[in-house]
A protein has these predicted regions:
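Nucleotidyltransferase catalytic core that binds NTPs
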Residues: 1-190
């Protein structure tokens, strides 16, 4: 199930725990955030939603940058479902979202429009106009809105933080990892 974040969620999905991030590539770090959100939602009998941005904010701010998308929305929707999410939520990254302050993002979107009960992000998550919000700001704003916030630390592989940038760099360098021909950075959600 896919929802557009510009619209209110159906009543059955309000009160969800939302994993929030770009989730391009859905690597081990992304999976840790998703798993925490799904586990939290299941423990409380709530829907689990994984939210993503399209286009990627970098693509919005630098439209002429080389292609770097690791997964399409359709692929992410399938991966999110395999991870246990009840739905995928897509924030259209456009002029309106780019000009939304951190406070507006939390109050107007996460709380008022989507009715989120909790949000899980990575520790490095930033949001809002000019990246005005981070996990600390999200937690502070959430506390005033009865929105609970959890942050998940980085996942290390071979001593390096697993990230979409690391994967893109490996792909652009044509690095092959013979010990794991399937994909060093991805893990089956099943």
């Amino acid at each position: 199930m896919r929802f557009d974040a510009s619209q209110p969620l159906p009543e059955a999905y309000r009160g969800a725990i939302i994993a929030l991030g770009n989730f391009d590539g859905f690597h081990l770090g992304h999976q840790a955030v998703a798993r925490a959100a799904v586990d939290w939602a299941r423990a409380e009998g709530r829907p689990a939603i994984i939210a993503t941005f399209d286009p990627h904010p970098v693509r919005y701010f630098k439209p002429d940058a080389l292609p770097f998308r690791l997964t399409t929305l359709d692929q992410r929707e399938e991966l999110f479902a395999q991870a246990g999410a009840d739905a995928m939520l897509v924030f259209a990254f456009d002029d309106a979202l780019a000009s939304t302050t951190a406070t507006e993002f939390v109050h107007d979107l996460l709380v008022a429009r989507l009715g989120a009960a909790g949000v899980v992000t990575g520790e490095d998550f930033t949001f809002g106009k000019a990246r005005g919000g981070n996990v600390g700001v999200l937690a502070d704003l959430g506390a005033t809105e009865n929105l609970r916030v959890r942050a998940i630390g980085p996942v290390l592989l071979g001593g390096e933080v697993v990230s979409s940038s690391l994967i893109r760099d490996a792909l652009s360098s044509e690095i092959i990892v013979p010990s794991n021909p399937a994909n060093t950075f991805l893990e089956s959600a099943g």
